[in-house]
Design a protein with these regions (language model features):
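Active-site-proximal loop->helix
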Residues: 66-78, 97, 102, 106
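Conserved beta-alpha-beta core of the PfkB/ribokinase-like small-molecule kinase fold
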Residues: 132-202, 212, 220-222
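A glycine-rich helix N-cap at a beta->alpha junction
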Residues: 74-89
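Short beta-strand scaffold segments in enzyme catalytic cores
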Residues: 47, 94-98, 105-106, 221-225
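Conserved phosphate-binding/catalytic region of the ribokinase-like
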Residues: 1-5, 165, 169, 190, ...
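Glycine-rich phosphate/adenosyl-contacting loop at the front of the ribokinase-like
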Residues: 1-61, 68-70, 241, 305-306
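Conserved phosphate-binding/catalytic loop of the ribokinase/pfkB sugar-kinase fold
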Residues: 61, 87, 97-133, 138
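Short gly/ser/thr-rich secondary-structure transition/capping motifs
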Residues: 79, 114-119, 156-163, 234-236
Length: 306
């Protein structure tokens, strides 16, 4: 069956250490817990979309190791097509997550994610071309983004995380950009992240993206800037957040889900804010991602107007 959503991105083994505070340079601190789990922005977004009821295919890479086999199994358990997940001659990617309740600081070693390039996307060009939505991030080589931009015919969403410079001709080929404050600053070459909504909007104007931009603002919600329309502030849902690790990834998946459901950008961002807020009420990355039934108890899969 043809997937509705293709995610081209990273697959990592997450090692999450619970700390009271992030250590300073040269300092050692003790962790109060260690959790190993599947992760990577690509995996998180794929699982998030699948749990919202979408048919999802993953294009990525893992190593020929226990972590890689565990990641494949985790995706298959979610009903995700892993035919596009290559086995690389290098270890599965690793992310060390320092969790400082509820925020996280993350260090990534790409490992097998380094082979997710133009050639790999080319092998799976038919799936990318035929998908109704394609989600990308920046934990894989830039060539993968170029290939998606040249191949996809559906809605393309780029989450430029982690914050790296993305050439204008690449980012402009994506319909929707979903940066956070820091990533937005990196895209425009600013030396500091924007504080106020006015500063965020000014940076979006500087970015001059021909498509839509949705800037995620954590507890402040999101600023939605549709192409050719006035910006709209979308408030965050009030929840007792315990872990924000996968909030941005679930937001991106839910935004695409809302657009595919027929919502406009603002409606879809409201739905994404709802999904992201729910994500923060549970611990972990993949483990925290909600199902549609968790959010719509009366059977309405995407209550965009609620």
């Amino acid at each position: 069956m043809t997937p509705e959503v293709v995610v081209v991105g990273s697959l990592n083994r997450d090692l999450r250490l619970t700390v009271d505070r992030i250590p300073r340079s040269g300092e050692t601190v003790s962790a109060s817990g260690l959790v190993r789990s599947p992760g990577g922005k690509g995996a998180n977004q794929a699982v998030a979309a699948a749990r919202l009821g979408r048919r999802v295919a993953m294009v990525g890479a893992v190593g020929d190791d226990d972590d890689g086999r565990a990641l494949r199994a985790a995706l298959v358990a979610e009903g995700i097509d892993v035919g596009g997940v290559a086995t690389a001659d290098r270890p599965t990617g690793t992310a060390v997550v320092l969790w400082e309740r509820p925020e996280s600081t993350i260090v990534i070693e790409a490992g097998a994610n380094a082979v997710v390039d133009e050639a790999l996307v080319g092998v799976h060009a038919a799936a990318v071309r035929d998908a109704r939505a394609v989600l990308c991030q920046c934990e894989t080589p830039l060539g993968a983004l170029r290939a998606v931009a040249a191949t996809a015919t559906g809605t393309t969403v780029l989450n430029p995380a982690p914050a790296v410079p993305v050439p204008r001709e690449v980012r402009d080929a994506f319909r929707v950009l979903v940066p956070n404050r820091f990533e937005l600053a990196t895209l425009v070459g600013a030396t500091h992240e924007p504080g106020s909504a006015e500063e965020v909007l000014a940076m979006v104007r500087t970015l001059d993206h021909p498509g839509d931009v949705v800037v995620t603002l954590g507890a402040d919600g999101a600023l939605v800037v549709p192409a050719g329309s006035a910006p709209v502030a979308v408030p965050a849902r009030a929840v007792d957040a315990v872990d924000t690790t996968a909030a941005g990834d679930s937001f991106c998946a839910a935004l695409a889900d809302g657009l595919l459901h027929g919502g406009d950008l603002v409606e879809s961002a409201r739905w994404a804010a709802r999904v992201a807020a729910s994500t923060t009420t549970r611990h972990g990355a993949v483990d925290s991602l909600p199902r549609a039934t968790d959010l719509a108890p009366e059977g309405t899969r995407i209550p965009l107007h609620s």
